[in-house]
């Protein structure tokens, strides 16, 4: 299976909603194919401690494991990849230091998409498709903006931002390779059930 095929159901951690290890295990049981560890305010030691546990879980479920922003942590926990924003370490520099990592890059507009592609990113995280409380600095792109980027992008696209069970089908109709979800999964009362339901919706569009 190519890495692109594992981008279809991409869950991002958020300890404001639930414990990372518990939420990831339930998400994986429910069909998640990629996990991203995002711990913006935690110490490096804590990130590595949690990251090692998530690496073990993702390996057991044959899912991809990404670390948000932190190349040092991604390397320390033997992650499959890293996801960076436009203000983080340039993709080209990451490729120089860690050529084996899968690199995802955030893109809020066409210029950022072109920058990510030219620097050698492996996939794009495109959004925010809808307003979201989990990333307050995100700029809303909207469905039309997502469609426009999807039409011309040369890389797999993972849509992100405010995606939930009621709007995910509209997002998938834009021709993306996957959807990244935070609160709709890790913030759910029953994470396993929520993940299973989301997985069924995704499978209608991406096999």
Curated annotation (Swiss-Prot):
Signal sequence annotation: none
GO BP, one annotated term: thiamine diphosphate biosynthetic process
Keywords: Magnesium, Metal-binding, Thiamine biosynthesis, Transferase
Pathway: Cofactor biosynthesis; thiamine diphosphate biosynthesis; thiamine phosphate from 4-amino-2-methyl-5-diphosphomethylpyrimidine and 4-methyl-5-(2-phosphoethyl)-thiazole: step 1/1
Cofactor note: Binds 1 Mg(2+) ion per subunit.
Top-level taxonomic group: Archaea
Binding of 4-amino-2-methyl-5-(diphosphooxymethyl)pyrimidine, residues: 36-40, 68, 106, 135
Protein function: Condenses 4-methyl-5-(beta-hydroxyethyl)thiazole monophosphate (THZ-P) and 2-methyl-4-amino-5-hydroxymethyl pyrimidine pyrophosphate (HMP-PP) to form thiamine monophosphate (TMP).
PANTHER family: THIAMINE BIOSYNTHETIC BIFUNCTIONAL ENZYME, THIAMINE-PHOSPHATE PYROPHOSPHORYLASE
Name of the protein described by the UniProt record: Thiamine-phosphate synthase
Native source organism of the sequence: Methanococcus maripaludis (strain DSM 14266 / JCM 13030 / NBRC 101832 / S2 / LL)
């Amino acid at each position: 299976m190519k890495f692109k095929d594992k981008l279809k159901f991409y869950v991002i951690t958020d300890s404001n909603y639930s414990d990372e290890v518990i939420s990831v295990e339930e998400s994986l049981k429910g069909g998640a194919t990629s996990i991203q560890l995002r711990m913006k305010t935690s110490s490096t030691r804590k990130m590595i401690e949690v990251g090692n546990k998530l690496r073990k879980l993702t390996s057991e479920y044959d899912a991809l494991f990404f670390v948000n922003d932190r190349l040092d942590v991604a390397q320390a926990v033997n992650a499959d990849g890293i996801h960076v924003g436009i203000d983080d370490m340039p993709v080209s520099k990451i490729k120089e230091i860690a050529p084996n990592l899968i690199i995802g890059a955030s893109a809020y507009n066409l210029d950022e998409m072109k920058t990510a592609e030219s620097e050698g990113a492996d996939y794009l995280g495109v959004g925010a498709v809808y307003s979201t409380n989990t990333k307050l600095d995100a700029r809303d792109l909207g469905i039309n903006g997502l469609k426009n980027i999807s039409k011309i992008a040369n890389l797999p696209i993972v849509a992100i931002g405010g995606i939930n069970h009621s709007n995910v089908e509209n997002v998938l109709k834009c021709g993306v390779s996957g959807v990244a979800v935070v609160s709709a999964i890790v913030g759910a009362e029953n994470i396993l059930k929520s993940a299973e339901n989301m997985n069924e919706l995704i499978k209608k569009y991406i096999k």
